[in-house]
A protein has these predicted regions:
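Hydrophobic, membrane-inserted alpha-helices
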Residues: 1-5, 53-63, 79-85, 137-141, ...
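N-terminal signal-anchor module of multipass membrane proteins
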Residues: 1-28, 232-233, 245, 249, ...
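Transmembrane helix interruption/hinge and helix-loop junction motifs
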Residues: 8-16, 63-74, 148, 161-170, ...
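Hydrophobic core segments of alpha-helical transmembrane domains in multi-pass membrane proteins
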Residues: 16-26, 70-83, 154-158, 169-181, ...
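C-terminal ends of transmembrane helices
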Residues: 30-40, 79-92, 139-148, 180-190, ...
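Membrane-interface helix-loop-helix junctions at boundaries between adjacent transmembrane segments
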Residues: 39-50, 57-122
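Alpha-helical transmembrane segments of multi-pass integral membrane proteins
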Residues: 83, 88-113, 124-146, 150-169, ...
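Predominantly late transmembrane helices and immediately cytosolic-facing juxtamembrane segments
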Residues: 160, 164, 172-201
Length: 264
């Protein structure tokens, strides 16, 4: 976080590149199917053909909707992100809302400027309501942290989004907290790095390459920033909705096979 802050102060373009690298490094954490077990845990599996096809179909639909109505899709993505991040925070679910809105307290104009560029919609008149909303969420998060005796973690989250620029703050949370937590949980079950690589690689490698290519194309001016962002949002959105739960209900409980066993 300090490094990103220093980079932003000394060289904003370098800070942006560093943040994009963090986003890319966090991509593999979502490259698995996660099905709930009877005891409430999540089993991680290599994506099946059915899951992959459904994922790609939903991503294509999301990208088409982004091209048609970018503001509506941006709003949907932010809502889905808040829910997704909140579900990954067992002690402080309000952290999900904070990750999405926290930067609006200190960096109101820069955050809205990002939303404006992506949605191609004028949003400056929402600056006061946006700041009030973010402040309300921050207070609620502090109260929740006090009630659950998790003040230190809440203070860390508040600091990240009040001290770092919006892109760096989200990138740091996404990689260092959200993605690494997922990998730690998987490692606790899988036990070895080799086993984790076999689990994550089939889906994460092509997505990682595609993400790097998209960032490069946008940097070189081959595609617009809103188009690149829409592609990234379309790829991420199916991971944030309960896709695995829907597929599980439609086909019944998943039956572990030798290649898929991940719990002992």
């Amino acid at each position: 976080g300090l490094a990103l802050g220093a980079l932003h102060a000394l060289s904003p373009p370098s800070a942006l590149i560093a943040a994009l690298v963090l986003f890319l490094l966090g991509v593999p954490h979502g490259a698995v199917e996660r099905h709930p077990t009877e005891d409430g845990r999540l089993q991680r599996y290599r994506p099946t053909l059915r899951y992959t096809a459904t994922y790609i179909l939903l991503a294509a639909l999301a990208f088409a909707l982004w091209l048609a109505t970018p503001l509506a899709m941006l709003a949907l993505f932010l809502i889905a992100s808040a829910i997704h991040f909140g579900e990954s925070e067992p002690r402080l679910p309000l952290a999900g809302l904070w990750v999405v809105a926290g930067s609006l307290i200190v960096f109101t104009e820069p955050t809205l400027a990002i939303f404006e560029e992506l949605s191609q919609t004028e949003l400056s008149h929402f600056s006061t309501p946006a700041r009030v909303l973010a402040l309300t969420i921050g207070i609620a998060l502090g109260v929740q942290a006090a009630l659950r005796r998790d003040i230190a973690y809440a203070a860390l989250l508040l600091g990240i989004f009040c001290l770092l620029d919006p892109v760096s703050a989200v990138a740091l949370y996404y990689f260092a907290i959200h993605s690494l937590r997922e990998w730690r949980e998987t490692h606790a079950v899988r036990g070895t790095i080799d086993s984790m690589m076999k689990l994550y690689a089939p889906f994460s490698v092509p997505v990682f390459i595609g993400g790097a290519a998209t960032i490069t194309a946008a940097y070189l001016g081959w595609i617009s920033t809103p188009t690149a962002a829409g592609f990234a949002i379309a790829i991420a959105l199916p991971h944030m909705v309960p896709l695995e739960r829907v597929l599980t209900r439609s086909r019944g409980p998943a039956r572990p096979t030798k290649a898929r066993t991940s719990a002992h």
